[in-house]
From Swiss-Prot:
InterPro entries: GNK2, GNK2_sf. This is Probable cysteine-rich repeat secretory protein 6. The keyword Secreted applies. It is found in: Secreted. It comes from the Eukaryota. Residues 1-21 form the signal peptide. GO terms for cellular component: extracellular region; plasma membrane. Belongs to the cysteine-rich repeat secretory protein family. The gene is CRRSP6. It comes from Arabidopsis thaliana (Mouse-ear cress). It holds the Pfam family Stress-antifung. Keywords: Repeat, Secreted, Signal.
């Protein structure tokens, strides 16, 4: 089941660590909340910071009683270091302390982690909003028909693998790199998929399926793309197509020797007739 979040009293940011540079966005007006809610919010953010320092890639926390309960979580990308994960969560929670103190719901996405809190429980729910999209726009695929023979199958493969990888060191995280050789040329294809561990396997599958639908809408002509939903993500990166030498009429020395030998044998056979 998909839960669409009400964006009233909502703070949504894209933030950056290192090379990526994304502008922060505040989508709504600010309102003041009771001191009890603010205290619970600060407790949740502090708890998330502390657990990220322990090497966790995912954690959720709850503080307070209704109507001032605050729910929070973080999820780090499965292929970054534990130190990078902790640094990302620390930066996000500190930014929330500074920029979102008057909001009852907040998301922060970056290239390495996602951090959020809300006054409504979102645990175990599949959500398709808000979502972040990033993809190459000035570096489109020269021959998309060649890549499209491989990319959909690779994404389908990861969607099947991710829900069954809950017991791996980073639950629900899978990645793969493949060198693809076709008649037209060769290229490297890297892809990854990840779900939040609070989802059950079937919900993980549903979430990733929704992301694939977004890929087909936004990014089918892009060399790389990243789509993050609140509970799952997909990424891929395709190298430039490298033409095969044989497809350009170029032969290696070995091929040339083989060709001359074959011709000599055929001439000898014909002369013997």
């Amino acid at each position: 089941m998909t839960r669409i979040i009400d964006v009233s009293l909502f703070c949504f940011f894209l933030f950056s660590l290192g090379a990526m540079s994304q502008p922060s966005q505040n989508l709504t007006d600010c309102n003041q909340f009771p001191d009890t809610y603010q205290s619970n919010r600060n407790t949740v953010l502090s708890t998330l910071r502390n657990h990220s320092s322990l090497g966790s890639y995912y954690f959720n926390a709850t503080a307070g009683l209704s109507p001032n309960t605050v729910y929070g979580m973080f999820l780090c990308i499965g292929n970054i270091s534990k130190t990078s994960c902790s640094n990302c969560v620390h930066s996000a929670t500190l930014e929330m302390d500074k920029s979102c103190e008057s909001h009852d719901t907040s998301f922060m996405f970056s290239d390495e982690c996602m951090v959020r809190y809300s006054d409504n429980s979102f645990f175990s729910l599949v959500e398709d909003s808000p979502a972040t999209f990033s993809y190459s726009q000035n570096d489109s695929l020269s021959y998309p028909q060649f890549y499209n023979q491989t990319l959909p199958g690779k994404l389908d493969e990861l969607i099947l693998k991710a829900p069954s990888s809950f017991s791996s060191p980073v639950p629900y995280f899978v990645e793969d790199k493949e060198h693809v050789t076709q008649v037209e040329g060769s290229y490297d294809l890297e892809a990854m998929a990840q779900c939040s561990p609070d989802l059950d396997p079937s919900s993980c599958t549903v979430c990733l399926g929704l992301v694939v639908e977004k890929f087909s809408e936004c990014c089918s002509q892009s060399r790389w793309a990243r789509i993050h939903f609140p509970k799952c993500l997909l990424r891929y990166d395709i190298s430039a197509l490298q033409p095969n030498l044989t497809s350009l009429g170029v032969t290696t020395k070995g091929d040339d020797i083989f060709g001359r030998t074959f011709i000599a044998i055929m001439i000898g056979l014909l002369m013997g007739l």
